[in-house]
């Protein structure tokens, strides 16, 4: 028998809190929200109407107990529309890049499957010993010449691990590899507003955001960057295995993350989640300065690389914060191309006076 009561609003997303006990918390400005729980991807198991009695501030929360929901999936409904949770750990119907499925339901697993890390831990390579290699997961191995089995996926990067090691790099920096909305599939999109970062059009005439600097569900690895999301509800294994295999080669994993109007709470929760759940070694953040400083001074993240374009606040007691020297990127490209009058700028950006 299922028992339902008010939950913990501070514990956002869907969390298992005990044997057959689960907490759900969703922030929304509506007067009521409906929690939908599915047995698999199609069969609706139960509906929970969350009215004002389940609300604390703008957060609806409930605790469900009495039945095993470890393999169940969920989403929310507002004004007759099914919407995914911003804290969703996985997202269904996103397994094909730039394809919007008819009658798609964007559901998330409540509990992820266990993963054997075999004692893996973040590597904590000092900055002075680091060489970053920035890649787009899909673009890096999608070519016919990549010589990997699963092209454009996290598994493809695993197959390139020996090559990356031979290059002498110490870290791969992944351009957005969480569930960004490249095609405008999520219902919270404003139909009159185009996502930022557009560079070409999709097949159906929709704007396509290839790079990922746009709206996103930041807690879920990008399903279309895996080889198994079309048939597995929990496809997170592939990202975790990529991190584990790269760590075995002495290569760190840095996640590039773009935030716009997300709250400092969500941003911090997100970084913590990726560090604890996926063992990533650092993040390159784009976001509000106040949120960046909150992340940088978070004791949970005190040994996690936190990188951005500038810092204006207190430094951590461990040397884990860094400025991302974007100016060097443009200068060195022009210098290597042989553009005129680049030597002085190149010398500046390779000296201690860079960006001072």
Residue ranges of predicted features:
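The feature marks proteins involved in alpha-glucan
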Residues: 1-18, 45, 55-136, 141-148
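Structural beta-strand segments of beta-rich domains
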Residues: 20-24
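Short proline/glycine-enriched turn/loop motifs at strand-loop junctions of beta-rich domains
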Residues: 27-32
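Conserved, mostly hydrophobic/aromatic
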Residues: 135, 164, 174, 274
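Aromatic- and acidic-residue-enriched carbohydrate-binding clefts of CAZyme catalytic domains
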Residues: 150, 185-248, 259-277
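Active-site neighborhood of glycoside hydrolase catalytic domains
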Residues: 248-251, 258-315
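Conserved alpha/beta catalytic core and glycan-binding cleft of carbohydrate-active enzymes
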Residues: 279, 292, 296-351
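A short, hydrophobic C-terminal helix/tail in secreted or cell-surface proteins
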Residues: 352-356
């Amino acid at each position: 028998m299922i028992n339902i009561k008010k939950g913990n609003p501070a514990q956002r997303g869907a969390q298992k809190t005990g044997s057959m006990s689960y907490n759900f918390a969703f922030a929304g400005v509506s007067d009521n929200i409906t929690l939908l729980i599915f047995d698999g991807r199609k069969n609706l198991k139960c509906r929970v109407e969350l009215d004002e009695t389940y609300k604390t501030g703008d957060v609806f929360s409930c605790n469900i107990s009495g039945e095993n929901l470890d393999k169940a999936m969920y989403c929310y409904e507002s004004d007759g529309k099914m919407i995914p949770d911003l804290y969703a750990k996985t997202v269904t119907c996103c397994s094909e890049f730039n394809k919007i499925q008819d009658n798609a339901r964007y559901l998330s697993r409540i509990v992820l499957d266990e993963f054997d890390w075999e004692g893996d831990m973040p590597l904590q390579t000092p900055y002075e010993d680091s060489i970053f290699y920035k890649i787009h997961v899909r673009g890096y191995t999608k070519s016919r010449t990549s010589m990997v089995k699963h092209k454009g996926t996290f598994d493809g990067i695993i197959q390139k691990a020996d090559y990356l090691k031979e290059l002498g790099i110490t870290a791969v920096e992944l351009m957005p590899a969480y569930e960004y909305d490249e095609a405008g599939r999520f219902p919270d999109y404003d139909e009159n507003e185009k996502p930022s970062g557009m560079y070409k059009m999709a097949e159906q005439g929709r704007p396509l955001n290839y790079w990922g600097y746009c709206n996103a569900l930041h807690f879920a690895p990008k399903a279309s960057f895996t080889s198994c999301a079309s048939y597995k509800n929990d496809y997170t294994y592939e990202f975790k295995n990529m991190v584990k295999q790269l760590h075995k080669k002495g290569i760190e994993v840095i996640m590039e993350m773009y935030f716009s109007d997300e709250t400092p709470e969500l941003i911090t929760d997100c970084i913590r989640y990726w560090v604890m759940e996926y063992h990533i070694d650092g993040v390159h953040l784009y976001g509000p300065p106040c949120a960046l400083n909150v992340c940088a001074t978070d004791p949970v993240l005190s040994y996690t690389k936190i990188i951005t374009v500038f810092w204006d606040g207190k430094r951590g007691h461990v040397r884990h914060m860094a400025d991302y020297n974007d100016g060097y990127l443009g200068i060195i490209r022009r210098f290597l191309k042989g553009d005129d009058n680049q030597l002085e700028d190149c010398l500046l950006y390779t000296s201690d006076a860079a960006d001072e």
